[in-house]
Amino acid sequence: MYLLDTNVVSELRKPRPHGAVVAWIEGIPDADLYLCAVTLGEIQADIEITREQNALKAAELEAWAEQLAASYNVLPMDAAIFRLWAKLMHRQSDTIYEDAMIAACAQKHKLTVVTRNVGDFAHFQVPLFNPFKN
């Protein structure tokens, strides 16, 4: 089972997404694909930045985010995950907050993180898969 990183779901929104990513995701049963609530938060943060400059584009992205939330199994950030996150963040840079949250969610639910940025997750000791390379 797989936890999709933000860069993977964002890739699928592109007019011409990477073929290997599309092929991989089409080959996985929907029931095996998960999002962490953090991913939806990252997307919403980008929508709010976009809204300041282009309300129409932000509305389009908002509709896409709603579709994402309805289409995937979304895992909440609960107390156990936040405790794992705190362990992962001990003596780490503040720049990896979101990645550490996604990694903690993956650890708790025993999921493989699917990301283009495997290096960002390498020290979290979670299984990783880069669909852009296949």
Task: Describe each PLM feature range.
Residues 1, 103, 108-134:
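Acidic, PIN/NYN-like endoribonuclease modules and their adjacent C-terminal/linker elements
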Residues 9, 40-43, 82, 121:
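A generic structural signal for short hydrophobic patches within well-formed alpha-helices
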Residues 5, 36, 95-96, 117:
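Histidine- and aromatic-rich ligand-binding microenvironments
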Residues 37-38, 78, 117, 132:
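Residues at the C-termini of beta-strands that transition into short coil/loop
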